Every structure is written in C-alpha cells, then in structure tokens.
Amino acid sequence: YYRTRSNVMNPNINLMNPTLSPTERNVADQALEHRFYIRNFKEKVANGQEVYYSFDKDGKIDWETLAGTMADQEFRNQLHRHQWMPAQAKAYRATGNEAYFTSWKKTYTDWMKAYANPKAAQGSDPVVWGGLQPAERVRDRMNFLPYFIQSAQFTPGWLSTVLKATADEGETIRQGYYREGSNIRLTQARVVATA
C-alpha cells in the first residue's frame, strides 16, 4: 500500500527526480562509516569537504564516549536529532545503493536500543527525549521515509517498527510539551499535528 499509493503528496520531497547535492552525498557517505553529521560541528575539513566526528568503536556505534568529551552541550542535543538520516535517504533514492538503507536501518535500530522511549523505560535521558530532539526526528522521518520505502529490505515488519516508534515519539512529545509561548513548543505542536 505505502509503495503504490499516489493520493498523498508531501511538498517537502521529490520522489520522481530527487537531487543529491555534493554536501548531502558527503553526509550520506560518511554516515556509512559511523561519521555522523551534527549541525555546526565537524572534526576537520579535508580536500574542501567537512569530515564529521566518528562514533565508530570496533565496528559498532558508541553514542556516548565522544559526546561525553564535548564541552558544548549543543553537540549532544544535535546528535540526537539524526541530521544525517535525510541525506542517506536522498542518497538511496538518487543512487539505488542499498548500503544507505542498510546503514540507516542498523543505525536507527542501534539508537532505539540505546535510548528506549520514555514510555517504555524509566529514567530516560531528557536530552534525548526533551525539547527539539524528538520533534526534529519525527519531522525529518516523515520527510525521508518515502525515499526509502521502495527498498526491497524495507519489509512490513520494519515498516511496523518505524511507524510504531514514530507514533510513540509523537505521543512522548505531546505528553511533554515545552513551556508555553516558546519556539520549541510551537515546533513540537506543529510536528504532532503533522504526524
């Protein structure tokens, strides 16, 4: 159904002729190696391209060690907004390379295990589940899922996992709105209404 429906239009995406900028390709390619784009943070610039911080530890993702060494709390906030995932989705759609889908699925699965939704776990991290972090994740996911939906690896089981996680995140946002009158609250409300 989700692969063949044509009556739903999202003005934020172009499935027919997706474009992939060199910057987006760089973000997507580095994510394959657990080097994640985090807005306003980069390890260095090499050959005119930003090189992002590596979260790889022995072939697995270490979400905490690097984040714990950064003096700026905004690094940790931005990390949990998953800003590299839209670029991976566009790269998949533009190239058909299943490595982007596989990387996204493994990374998102790993993240969900490391940071269980507060509805399911006591003592969940307020940085991960508060403020703009869940709102940006849900907003971006609604925009990038259509790019991945045609992957042969996007099984009904995985779709159910992602849709349930998205619904749970939306409910977590709704139950924990930021203070009245803030831009964060406005963003949260917009995401909940759209989701």
Predicted features, each with a name:
Residues Y1-Y53:
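Extreme N-terminal leader/anchor segments
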Residues F55, G59-I61, T65-A195:
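Aromatic-lined, polymer-binding surfaces characteristic
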